[in-house]
């Protein structure tokens, strides 16, 4: 049978999602816990491979197993064998046609900026700290040029392995909640470091270092070297993955929990 899981994790203690031989990873910890509960080796497929230090409240994974367990047994059993910074939010048996990555029609990320003169003591691994007066409204205006299917070469990592630089951005919103600035962006898929590279350039506009038209200029240039530095990983969350209605996957609050939805 095929099982889908919704998971959340604090990525600050891991070298990213993907299993690696020499370092700790979210995938490695989940596969270990699932293999204990299933009493057989389990291999996982995920909706989006997050980088080192990046978090998730809405990651979706799937695996195949011969083990017969009810949803409660999977959830409680796996959580009991996971570190405290990874948790299963829901479990659902799915059709064999479901694939966590290839069935997904959209991914959504939130980047949380703590905009204050002094660094945070609490949530220091859950937000990215930037001082200076950030104009969230300008960032939002500038970001609207990113909508639609476009060539995002200027915002892809040098090591990106995607065969095409084209992605379709469905929505992008920048809002302020007190000391926090939140960049919320959804697309059919993302290039390596695409969200953090977009945020890095939007911050230059929000801080007044670049004009509102700069994002459009960068898109036209198709040159990563012309854009701003990659934003820090700590404030980034994979908050949602969209699938066709036929799979009837649970929908929970997006998070992160310390932000208002």
From Swiss-Prot:
One of its GO terms (biological process) is tRNA pseudouridine synthesis. Substrate binds at residue 109. Signal peptide: none annotated. The keyword Acyltransferase does not apply. Its EC number is 5.4.99.12. Keywords: Isomerase, tRNA processing. One of its GO terms (molecular function) is tRNA pseudouridine(38-40) synthase activity. It is an enzyme of class 5 (isomerase). It comes from the Bacteria. It holds the Pfam family PseudoU_synth_1. It catalyses: uridine(38/39/40) in tRNA = pseudouridine(38/39/40) in tRNA. SUPFAM superfamilies: Pseudouridine synthase (SSF55120). CDD domains: PseudoU_synth_EcTruA. The active site is at residue 51. Coiled coil: none annotated. Belongs to the tRNA pseudouridine synthase TruA family. Formation of pseudouridine at positions 38, 39 and 40 in the anticodon stem and loop of transfer RNAs. Homodimer. This is tRNA pseudouridine synthase A. It comes from Shewanella sp. (strain W3-18-1). The gene is truA.
